Amino acid sequence: MPAAISRNWPAPAKLNLFLHINGRRADGYHELQTLFQFIDYCDMLDFKVTETPELILHSNMSGVVADSDNLILRAAKSLQQTTGFNGGAEIWLDKRLPMGGGLGGGSSDAATTLVALNTLWHTQLSTEELAKIGLKLGADIPVFIHGFAAFAEGVGERLQAVNPSEPWYLVIAPDAHVSTADVFQDPLLPRDTPKLAIDTLMSQPWANDCQKLVVSKYPQVAKALGWLLEYAPSRMTGTGACVFGEFTQQQQALAALAKLPSEMQGFVAQGMNLSPLITRLSHP
């Protein structure tokens, strides 16, 4: 009897509510302080366990390449290698999040793959063990595996659960692809923001140290942010290109979305301190 397909595993987007760069390490990585919060806007993945070890990925988006560099396949392969599981999986990705926009879609897809297959393969790794696998694939992956809003330090791997407010956001995805590597290699990027205690950071105005540089180099980002600032406190997430405005009421965010210029694309979503992946995990 063929295995059933396990459906609707969410891979939520994240926002960096603030992002401070505190320095550059000898290995080239940057020391950061940032606040991650999920939003209820997700890619969705389906999985079918197979008896043979092949890993097969299908996607609804032509830009998703199912090769050895794909994070979903790398995550599944890493779980196979770590656990010695000799079966495989067929995976379907319904890609909804903008690619390369600073919303963490690729990292979230990889995290959901690790969490879902650990359940479906009955490999029984702990959350910490999954996070260690994830960290080798990308610095943002552990926060998606743990599934709670978090204050992060180091290169983003040291996480502390936090509980910020859960407002509504209007997220705009400018028609620009910002290279994270280029941003972090740019000599004009500020790298000297002092490290502060979490209580201080949570109570002061929030900012993104990458924003000024990205806005200066990408006019599409500058235009989107300038428009959004007319309606709400707004800033960039990650290294861009997406920007977000914060609203207390859903209707306020939807009203602003209705006025969005035709050349821009956006969506409204609510902040979530508990990832929908954790909710899905309780109904495998």
From Swiss-Prot:
GO terms for biological process: isopentenyl diphosphate biosynthetic process, methylerythritol 4-phosphate pathway; terpenoid biosynthetic process. One of its GO terms (molecular function) is 4-(cytidine 5'-diphospho)-2-C-methyl-D-erythritol kinase activity. The active site is at 14, 140. ATP binds at residues 98-108. Keywords: ATP-binding, Isoprene biosynthesis, Kinase, Nucleotide-binding, Transferase. Gene3D superfamilies: 3.30.230.10, GHMP kinase, C-terminal domain. InterPro entries: GHMP_kinase_C_dom, GHMP_kinase_C_sf, GHMP_kinase_N_dom, IspE, Ribosomal_Su5_D2-typ_SF, Ribsml_uS5_D2-typ_fold_subgr. Its EC number is 2.7.1.148. Coiled coil: none annotated. Catalyzes the phosphorylation of the position 2 hydroxy group of 4-diphosphocytidyl-2C-methyl-D-erythritol. Belongs to the GHMP kinase family. IspE subfamily. This is 4-diphosphocytidyl-2-C-methyl-D-erythritol kinase. The gene is ispE.
